[in-house]
A protein has these predicted regions:
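Intrinsically disordered, low-complexity linker/tail regions enriched in Pro/Ser/Thr
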Residues: 3-4, 19-20
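Sec-dependent N-terminal signal peptides
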Residues: 4-13
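Sec/Tat signal peptide C-region and signal peptidase I cleavage site
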Residues: 14-18
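Stable alpha-helical elements in mature extracytoplasmic
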Residues: 21, 58, 62, 89-90
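Short sequence/structural segments immediately N-terminal
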Residues: 25-27
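The canonical Cys-X-X-Cys-His
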Residues: 29-36, 93
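Axial heme c-ligation environment in periplasmic c-type cytochrome domains
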Residues: 41-52, 65-94
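Short hydrophobic/aromatic patches at helix-to-coil boundaries
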Residues: 97-101
Length: 101
């Protein structure tokens, strides 16, 4: 019985991190300022993917930017820090953003 309970708990926690990236972006309020195809307040995810294409440090840079915020890269409006986004969630989001073509 303990084995079944442990397996169920593991599956539930794993599915939380396997959450669809677009839903995660919505849940974390990323889509308040960003869209996939066009600039809103912040850049479109396709613009971000194009800018960082071929940059081997993109994942590290952008995970940090998602969590800590930043300014000056895409214009005068700063991106606020997002402390409610875990490092794992930020990595899922950034991987998805960088996959936009």
């Amino acid at each position: 019985m303990k084995t079944i309970l442990a397996a169920a708990l593991f599956a539930a926690s794993a599915s939380a991190f396997a959450q669809e990236p677009a839903k995660l972006a919505q849940d974390k309020a990323c889509l308040t300022c960003h869209t996939v195809d066009r600039k809103l307040v912040g850049p479109a995810y396709k613009e971000v993917a194009a800018k960082y294409a071929g940059d081997k440090e993109a994942m590290t840079k952008l995970v940090k930017k998602v969590r800590d915020g930043g300014q000056g890269v895409w214009g005068p409006v700063p991106m606020p820090p997002n402390p409610s986004v875990s490092e794992k969630e930020a990595a899922v989001l950034v991987k998805w953003i960088l996959s936009q073509k």
